[in-house]
Amino acid sequence: MAKDKNKYVDPATYPSLSDHEISTVRKIYSFTETYFQNPRFDASHDFQHVRRVLGNALTILEKEEEERKQKALPALNPLSVILGALLHDVEDKKYVDVTTDGQKMTLQKAVIEAGMSQSYAEHVQLLVEGVSYSSEIKNPQHVKDLIDIIPELGIVQDADRLDAIGAIGIARCFTFGGAKGARSLQDSIQHFEDKLLKLEGMMKTEAGKAMAKERSDRIREFMKWWKDEAGPTVASN
């Protein structure tokens, strides 16, 4: 069984961050923690989700950096990975009725107030906009092109999608369905087939692919247990 537990409890301790970047990380971490205290967010999309995504991202980042060194590829930007992970669900349209401009205002303001430039804030915004699963389904080529420009996006994408599968993903799926009140238990099981089990094939990094394989297998095993216990599904009239 893979051992992928993130060792960076404090993201500001990630190697190679400058003093200024460490300060920025701490400010954005605090901003995000406060932001997700709003009761509109349920347990499927809360600060604990953000922390898990951040942990996944740093685990993948470390492995990707090692691989890039071996292949003499350009270095990645740890700050972009960290901020992208922390901010990826700010003004999520599933919870907040805002325009894209409204999201940009919130994200960019937070990054600028944390000590970064307007141009870098726009860079982080572009990364965050590319994380969305629905956006990739609508225009996969755009996301592919964006990852070519911002390779850190692939890491944050994988990190977020990993939290949608495995044991955590199962819990989050049922939690979201219950919180929104529009999805039955059987509908949630169907969601595993319709979306969650497809995420493994959408991973961008080698580390993400390996982690997704194990977590997807856990969903498949759970679905076997569900069918054993629930019996045949009877369609309602």
Task: Describe the role of every protein-language-model region.
Residues 2-20, 39-47, 51-74, 87, ...:
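Divalent metal-dependent phosphate-bond-processing catalytic cores, especially two-metal-ion Mg2+/Mn2+ enzymes
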Residues 117-124:
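Membrane-interface starts of transmembrane alpha-helices
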Residues 58, 87, 91, 107-112:
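Amphipathic alpha-helical segments within well-ordered protein domains
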Residues 53, 101-113:
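An active-site-proximal "capping" alpha-helix that borders the catalytic cofactor pocket
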Residues 17-35:
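Short alpha-helical hairpin
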